[in-house]
Amino acid sequence: MLIACEESQAECAAFRALGHIAYSCDIQPCRPGGNPYWHIQGDVTPLLKGDTAFVTQAGFLRTVPRWDLIICHPPCTYLCKVSSVHMKIGGRIQWPRLRNMILARRFFMQCINAEAKYVAVENPLPMARAHLPQPSCFVQPSWFGVKYTKKTLYWLKNLPPIMPQLEHPNPRCFVTASRGKYRSRTFPELAHAIATQWSQYILDDMK
């Protein structure tokens, strides 16, 4: 199993805890306290094709003939709806930002078309200009006991939607002064639900 664009290793660790062979991959090293033996630091694009060899952050060579499951968290900076306000300044298109959106969309589609039987791609609500495919479903962290709401969309291939487990009675919007990687990290409760539900589904489907 490959978790693309994940330095937090939240989902990777959740799958590992269930006994699955899972790796995270990100251009950044895994966060302090993470497991470098499970992390691949570098461009994930070649790995999306499967039948690959790579060196973990800890320096060990691994080979994978195929991935059973690929979960991708492509960067949303230039794709999400909230960033669309920066696309124009004074009524004029900001061409460098438009170019970055096009490149981000290209990578997003590479994730959707990853060569695995089961694929999931996660992102927030996209801007209309990006022309992304319709998402398959959405989730809220509060559905799994987290006290925050942070609507997240999923594009799925051969996977069912993640089902709610324990609704928090009084959730509030997830707002933080931090940006980037911290804001995009998967809550552990959601990571556990993803690993539990999808791994069981895949095991049943493979019987």
Predicted segments with their positions:
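Conserved active-site and SAM-binding loop architecture
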Residues: 1-207
